[in-house]
Swiss-Prot record:
This is Putative flagellar protein FlgJ homolog. Coiled coil: none annotated. Belongs to the FlgJ family. Keywords: Bacterial flagellum biogenesis. The keyword Ribosomal protein does not apply. The lineage of its organism: Bacteria, Pseudomonadati, Pseudomonadota, Gammaproteobacteria, Enterobacterales.
């Protein structure tokens, strides 16, 4: 499978999931507010990890499309695991949603 196609499929899945979540929030905002806040925190962590990783020097033999693909997938999984325990943003986001 082409690496770009795989990344595209992963991105499509994320977009579909976010669209489904937006739909659920419109139907019953109070029920899905916590899940939405957790998802926003997860996306923030993923962007943070990607930004930190991009600041590293990339002058090595392992810097290729395949390693970047698997690093992106790893960062996505890592961000999901970190966001399960949370870093404190969920409560702040939840307060903003409920205003």
């Amino acid at each position: 499978m082409n690496d770009n196609l795989l990344l595209s499929n992963i991105s499509d899945y994320n977009v579909q999931f976010i669209n489904e979540l937006k739909y659920q929030v419109r139907i019953n905002p109070k029920k899905h507010a916590l899940q939405t806040a957790k998802e926003v925190e997860g996306v923030f962590i993923q962007v943070l990890l990607k930004s930190m990783r991009s600041s590293l020097l990339k002058d090595n033999l392992l810097d290729n499309n395949q390693s970047r693909l698997y690093t992106d997938i790893y960062d996505q999984q890592l961000s999901q695991e970190i966001s399960k325990k949370g870093i404190g943003l969920t409560d702040i986001i939840l307060k903003q949603i409920e205003k």
